[in-house]
Structures are given as C-alpha cells and as structure tokens.
C-alpha cells in the first residue's frame, strides 16, 4: 500500500465514503455533487447531497454496496498541503471496524437513535456533546471508529426522520473535527496505513477497542444531551 507521507489522506473523502456506505446499508442512495475539500485546519464547504430511499429498502452489509450508487468524484484540496488519494483498503478496513462495533452494540445503537431526538436545531449540539465526551480522556483507534459509527447513526436517523439536508452538516462537522482535532494524532500514530496494518483482514479481530468504556461514554454523553435539552425546554 502506498504511503501517504506526513500530510496524510483526505479526511473529507474518508468521511463521505463512510457515510455513503452506512446509508447504502439502509437502502438509501447518495448522490454527491461536485464538491471541493477544504484544507486541513479549515472548515470544509458543505456538499450538495440528495437522498432517494428505495421503495423496498433491504439492509445489506456487503462492502461493494456503495459502488452500486452514483460514483463519488475525486476530492481534491484547492489550497493547503497536497493530500494523497485514499487507498480502497483504508475504506474497507474502516467499514469492517464500524460494522464490528455496531454488531456488538446493535441494541445500544438502536436505543441511541431513539434518544437523539434530532432536529435541525439540536443536531449540532448532539454531535458536539457526544464527540467531546468520547475524546475527553484521549484518542485511540477504537474511539475514532466509534466517532465514525456515531456519525453514521446520525446520518441514517436524519434520513429516517425526513431531514436529509442534515447529512450535509454532519459530514462537514465530522470532517472539520478530524482535520482540527484528530489528524495530528492519526499522523503521529502511523496514519491510516497503521490502522490498516493493525486491524486489517489478516490481523487480529477488533477486540481491543475498550468496548465497554466506549459504550459508557456514549451513554453518558446522550444522558447529558437529554438533560441539557430538558433544561432548555424548561425555560421556554
């Protein structure tokens, strides 16, 4: 696999293809417009997304599902450091890790979806609260996988509740957080290539992600978000 060098891979591409995959699992098509990525450390420009749920959506976990929808155009940064194209194995390994995480806590993620109470006005607060709690005690690959899976849950829930435009914002928030808060850690720990080497198909299963701690963090963050919402509504 080609080495990305110090600048690393394009986080926006990684986010967009992951969300595309998670929506494809639920039978939604994701058409991505001509969107340029923002440089590292800057807020990216929102994309142009459209969602068309199939008449009879059938969940699927096949890795090639995303390829059946409209292809993603290459994402090239207009300014800032030149980013390397993301190798397919990075996307596949991240999907595998996310699927493993969601299988282990399928019931908890279902409960999380019902507790999010997403609206156009609460979505950013929900995202910020959970992500802040998730990385409060530091960063590791397990928490990064949980970050992607949580973003996927938010996107699916947004489409389920007929709030598809929220996915634009969620993709932007995820990319911005990766660029500003996680990119340095990822590069200092070998980049996404190291993630593939550690958790690729031929390596050990993803059993060292501190699943219970992640579950507790996500639950605590959701409780905090609900308390905050209750306090806000109490003053309305």
UniProtKB/Swiss-Prot annotation:
Any Pfam family matching the protein: Bcl-2
Membrane topology: Single-pass membrane protein
One GO cellular component term: mitochondrial outer membrane
SMART domains xrefs: BCL, BH4
InterPro entries given in the database record: Apop_reg_Bcl2, Bcl-2-like_sf, Bcl-2_BH1-3, Bcl-2_fam, Bcl2-like, Bcl2/BclX, Bcl2_BH1_motif_CS, Bcl2_BH2_motif_CS
Biological process per Gene Ontology, one example term: autophagy
Source species, domain of life: Eukaryota
PTM comment, free text: Phosphorylation/dephosphorylation on Ser-70 regulates anti-apoptotic activity. Growth factor-stimulated phosphorylation on Ser-70 by PKC is required for the anti-apoptosis activity and occurs during the G2/M phase of the cell cycle. In the absence of growth factors, BCL2 appears to be phosphorylated by other protein kinases such as ERKs and stress-activated kinases. Phosphorylated by MAPK8/JNK1 at Thr-69, Ser-70 and Ser-84, which stimulates starvation-induced autophagy. Dephosphorylated by protein phosphatase 2A (PP2A). Proteolytically cleaved by caspases during apoptosis. The cleaved protein, lacking the BH4 motif, has pro-apoptotic activity, causes the release of cytochrome c into the cytosol promoting further caspase activity.
Locus of motif BH1: 133-152
Transmembrane residue ranges: 209-230
UniProt site (Cleavage): 64-65
Oligomeric and partner information: Forms homodimers, and heterodimers with BAX, BAD, BAK and Bcl-X(L). Heterodimerization with BAX requires intact BH1 and BH2 motifs, and is necessary for anti-apoptotic activity. Component of the complex, at least composed of LRPPRC, BECN1 and BCL2; the interactions prevent BECN1 from forming an autophagy-inducing complex with PIK3C3. Interacts with EI24. Also interacts with APAF1, BBC3, BCL2L1, BNIPL, MRPL41 and TP53BP2. Binding to FKBP8 seems to target BCL2 to the mitochondria and probably interferes with the binding of BCL2 to its targets. Interacts with BAG1 in an ATP-dependent manner.
Function noted in UniProt: Suppresses apoptosis in a variety of cell systems including factor-dependent lymphohematopoietic and neural cells. Regulates cell death by controlling the mitochondrial membrane permeability. Appears to function in a feedback loop system with caspases. Inhibits caspase activity either by preventing the release of cytochrome c from the mitochondria and/or by binding to the apoptosis-activating factor (APAF-1). Also acts as an inhibitor of autophagy: interacts with BECN1 and AMBRA1 during non-starvation conditions and inhibits their autophagy function.
Name of the protein this chain belongs to: Apoptosis regulator Bcl-2
